């Protein structure tokens, strides 16, 4: 084998200056591996940041995986090592052999690798970025023109690509990106979802981590194909009218010796002190957000997914663990900030910076925070003191609602506040209402199995839950399998129980989800004022004895929608509900319809509002189906 001879590589001083300042927005085009030609020879240029390393060599299939012979050369005092290596081809596997400041030699994956080999291998793959001709220009232009979808319908289908569907019989369990495009896109659009949210697709070594322990931050996982395969998938989503959100993990990274940890023999990407640099629950390292180069690594990574893969949004995982220095720590296990407080000021600055940069460079791209505390202003602009996210997951709504519905209906009257409490803070943030993967794992059971009663009551409760979620102010998110009433808890090692579609009750649940999405899209009152009190008005929140609530969804100049919910299995006849106008109110939704698997109790499709001579105004008198929600709209007239 001919051993290629590496050569010094020139890097523009301004690029190195921007990197040192933490401000290089195209950093992934400077560091990492990229095709190049030098002195008429084709090869790849390699660059890696390892300021405390004693030496760095390239090892790969281009040189028989020798640990020496292809050295990288220090670029001034920047801490970057770089070289041009002729003869390296697209698809070549490689690692960096780093002799650290501690004298130890480790084989490291490239932090900026554009692709990586299939697990259990962890080598990086020499690849290139500009390898796809995009066809989603109309989508991208319209997204930028419209801006954030605060007043537009957003219904998110959360998906783990490795277990949505699986192949059988050929030894490779995963669908390719192209096969996922053939099957997942028409399925999600057929149900009326506006966006997919994908659990992390950045390369990760352990299937059981679901992608939340990222090994290669810049490499789409090879489980489903190549980076351009993922680009084709996103392109097809956009051309079908479906947005794509990625779960992104800037909170922590795994301790594997080949990864970012102790990269140059020192705590480079993480803090040295375990009270700052190690997560006690997950056994992972925490990024040092106060270091310019680390912050640049993460910020450029966020921009990379948005720019190079046309991603429509990033959902940031475990934001609460970033914000608090004492997160999941006892007294004496954490260090206070410079003011003596528990807030991680460096992480706060990082989150504000990355949100500001994303919204400036990509108008219309969303950032979503999984933040489970009462930190103020998560989805408020940075210039007002907020963190700058577009949306925040409403974990309180999820916890209270699922807790309420887990109660036997006979006890729900004593927990009525759990149902109504969310409206006290519903407009304090731009909320997404999540029924996510976290609620159907680790012994929690599937959503359907959380519901009390016999099989019919469980299914009715689930339909009631979905109607309440869609009617409640806030954007919507549902994890895969929930749309047809998956019985079993989610297992990342097997596909969903698609056989349940053969049962009419489960098919009915899917029909309901599709109709709720169509109602969300077609009725402005269902989405236009999701984050403002002017879009919601209680009709009756106090009938705890019957476990019935009712409210209006409103939009200026549009017809109001009246929602009524009966959280007991009792049919309530001649039930009076105030309404804002007289005339006929047509039924738009009844979750007890036989079409959805219900008992078909209803009001023949419409009710007549009558004048209330005693208290003024108008009311309707109707039959409330058991464990069901109903939605009515006035037949004539506009506005509120």
Swiss-Prot record:
Family annotation (InterPro entries): A-amylase/branching_C, Branching_enzy, GlgB, GlgB_N_E_set_prok, Glyco_hydro_13_cat_dom, Glyco_hydro_13_N, Glyco_hydro_b, Glycoside_hydrolase_SF
Active site annotation, chain numbering: 317 (nucleophile), 370 (proton donor)
GO BP term, example: glycogen biosynthetic process
Name of the top EC class for this enzyme: transferase
Molecular-function GO terms, alphabetical: 1,4-alpha-glucan branching enzyme activity; cation binding; hydrolase activity, hydrolyzing O-glycosyl compounds
Annotated NCBIfam families: branching_enzym, PRK05402.1, PRK12313.1
Subunit structure: Monomer.
Protein name: 1,4-alpha-glucan branching enzyme GlgB
Organism name: Nitratidesulfovibrio vulgaris (strain ATCC 29579 / DSM 644 / CCUG 34227 / NCIMB 8303 / VKM B-1760 / Hildenborough)
């Amino acid at each position: 084998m001919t051993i290629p001879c590496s050569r010094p590589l020139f890097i523009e001083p301004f690029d190195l200056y921007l990197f040192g300042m933490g401000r290089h927005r195209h950093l992934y085009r400077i560091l990492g591996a990229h095709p190049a030609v030098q002195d008429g020879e084709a090869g790849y240029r390699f660059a890696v940041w390892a300021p405390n390393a004693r030496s760095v060599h390239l090892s790969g299939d281009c040189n028989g995986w020798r640990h020496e012979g292809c050295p990288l050369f220090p670029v001034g005092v920047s801490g970057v090592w770089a070289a041009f290596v002729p003869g390296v081809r697209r698809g070549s596997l490689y690692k960096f052999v780093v002799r650290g400041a501690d004298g130890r030699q480790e084989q490291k994956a490239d932090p900026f690798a554009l692709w990586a080999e299939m697990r259990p291998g962890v080598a990086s793959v020499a690849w290139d970025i500009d390898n796809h001709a995009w066809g989603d220009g109309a989508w991208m232009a319209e997204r930028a023109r419209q801006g954030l979808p605060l007043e537009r319908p957003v219904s998110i289908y959360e998906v783990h690509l490795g277990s949505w569907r699986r192949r059988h019989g050929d030894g490779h369990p995963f669908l390719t990106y192209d096969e996922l495009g053939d099957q997942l896109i028409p399925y999600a659009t057929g149900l009326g979802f506006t966006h997919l949210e994908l659990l992390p697709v950045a390369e990760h070594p352990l299937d059981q981590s679901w992608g939340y322990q990222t090994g290669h931050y810049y490499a789409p996982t090879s489980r489903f194909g190549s980076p351009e395969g993922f680009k084709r998938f996103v392109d097809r989503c956009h051309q079908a009218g479906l947005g794509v959100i990625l779960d992104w993990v800037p909170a922590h990274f795994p301790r594997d010796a080949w990864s970012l940890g102790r990269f140059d023999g020192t705590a480079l990407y993480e803090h040295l002190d375990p009270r700052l640099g190690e997560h006690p629950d997950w056994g992972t390292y925490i990024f040092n957000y106060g270091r310019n180069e680390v912050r640049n690594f993460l910020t450029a990574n966020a921009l990379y997914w948005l720019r190079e893969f046309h991603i429509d949004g990033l959902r940031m995982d475990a934001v609460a663990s970033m914000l608090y220095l004492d997160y999941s720590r006892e007294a004496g296990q954490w260090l206070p900030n410079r003011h003596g407080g528990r807030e991680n000021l460096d992480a706060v600055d990082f989150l504000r910076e990355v949100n500001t940069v994303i919204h400036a460079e990509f108008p219309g791209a969303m950032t979503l925070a999984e933040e489970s505390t009462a930190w103020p202003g998560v989805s408020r602009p940075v210039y007002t003191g907020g963190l700058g996210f577009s949306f925040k997951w409403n974990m309180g709504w999820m916890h209270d609602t699922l807790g309420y519905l887990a109660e036997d209906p006979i006890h729900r009257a004593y927990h009525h506040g759990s149902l109504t409490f969310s409206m006290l803070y519903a407009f304090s943030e731009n909320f997404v209402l999540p029924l996510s993967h976290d609620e159907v794992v680790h012994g929690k059971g599937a959503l359907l199995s959380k519901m009390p009663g016999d099989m019919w009551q469980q299914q009715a409760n689930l339909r009631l839950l979905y109607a309440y979620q869609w009617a409640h102010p806030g954007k919507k998110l549902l994890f895969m399998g929930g749309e047809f009433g998956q019985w079993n808890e989610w297992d990342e090692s097997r596909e969903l129980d698609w056989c349940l579609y053969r049962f009419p009750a489960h098919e009915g649940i899917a029909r309901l989800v599709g109709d709720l999405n169509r109602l969300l899209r077609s009725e402005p009152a269902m989405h236009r004022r999701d984050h403002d009190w002017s879009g919601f008005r209680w009709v009756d929140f106090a009938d705890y004895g019957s476990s019935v609530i009712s409210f209006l969804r409103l939009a200026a100049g549009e017809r109001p929608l009246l929602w009524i919910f009966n959280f007991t299995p009792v049919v309530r006849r001649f039930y009076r509900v105030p309404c804002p106008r007289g005339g006929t109110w047509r039924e738009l939704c009844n979750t007890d319809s036989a079409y959805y698997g219900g008992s078909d109790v209803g009001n023949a499709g419409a009710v007549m509002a009558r004048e209330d001579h005693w208290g003024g105004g108008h009311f309707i008198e109707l039959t409330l189906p058991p464990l069901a929600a109903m939605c009515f709209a006035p037949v004539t007239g506009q506005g509120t």
